[in-house]
Amino acid sequence: IYFAGQMQNINMLGSSSEIINNLVKSQQYLIDEIYLFQDQFKESLVNAATDITGYGFIGHLKEMVESSNLYRQSNNLEPLKVLLDLFAFKAYPGVFDLIRKDVKSTFFESNKEIFDKIYKVNKQKRIINFLNENSLDQETFNERISLLLDPQTCGPLLISCNRKYENVLKDKWYKVGEVVKM
């Protein structure tokens, strides 16, 4: 969203330096931290992981859940779904202003099609649901979803881990949802 705004000559002076600094910052230290925790606990910390580039958060999460459910189906296990907290996602200052101005990246519409296919499914069978969906007005819900459809160019990491590691990871990572059985 930030770069789409820049291409439209919308300047976000309050966020520009923070965004650029984060773009050039390697995320290798986060991977190294996961390896350290795995060494400490003597077991795998991560069930699945991906970086959020191209398909936005929703697209990558969809791929992770569908892949897990294929494995689970072939092993006669109950399928999973994810409950997301739309207010757990952080955004740079000014990003929601850009969303309200209808600033979108070039991949937004294709990512929106992915979301629409997920969202039109009956809520009970949907692989991605939203914890606070019923308490939000439609405008706020759409703004939050727009954030999750933005194709990051240097995206953060999305990991799925066992709930027992939540307290260990919460200092440098943040929880945006939980995986539950369908």
What spans do the regions from the language model cover?
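Helix-biased detector of long, well-ordered alpha-helical tracts
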Residues: I1-M182
